[in-house]
Design a protein with these regions (language model features):
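A short secondary-structure junction signal
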Residues: 12-13, 71, 106-108, 141-144
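Aromatic- and Lys/Arg-enriched surface recognition patch
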Residues: 57-128
């Protein structure tokens, strides 16, 4: 799961302990939250749009996707006038901090590792904030981050 550290970082998650993953406004990602992520699933925290881009830690899904409250807040940059409490358009899971990697696994490192040759993250034009990993890819990131 990708996030800009200027918005929310692995350090912020570590301090908070848990966090509702808000502000995602992409239907494909919303559907992943709703249909694929389950309590107990693990996820990689990935810092994007920063000097040091890469995988920085691990988190766990502790609550399945629920309506994102920012979609109803007219003062929020994530407000969606077409969304209603009866028919919310946007969802997000609640995650908890598991660990911070000792070593940032850079995008360059990921690109140069054959384990990730089919990973959407390294494909041209991919802008999704959530990318599915195979078990092998997940385990490799954990190993590289040690």
């Amino acid at each position: 799961m990708k996030c800009e550290p200027s918005e929310f970082s692995i350090d912020d998650l570590e301090r908070a302990g848990e966090y509702f993953w808000d502000g995602v406004r992409n239907y494909q990602v919303r559907n992943m939250f709703r249909d694929q992520m389950r309590v107990g699933d693990k996820a990689i925290f990935y810092h994007s749009s920063t000097k040091d881009v890469g995988a920085v830690g691990e988190m766990e899904i502790i609550k399945q996707a629920t309506p994102d409250p920012t979609q109803f807040d007219s003062k929020s940059k994530y407000f969606d006038a077409k969304s209603t409490t009866a028919n919310p358009r946007w969802l997000g899971p609640t995650v908890s901090f598991v660990k911070k990697f000792n070593h940032l696994v850079s995008l360059e490192e990921i690109k140069n590792d054959s384990t990730f040759s089919d990973l959407a993250l390294i494909k041209r034009g991919n802008r999704l904030s959530v990318i599915e990993l195979s078990k092998k890819q997940y385990e490799r990131l954990i190993k590289l981050g040690k």
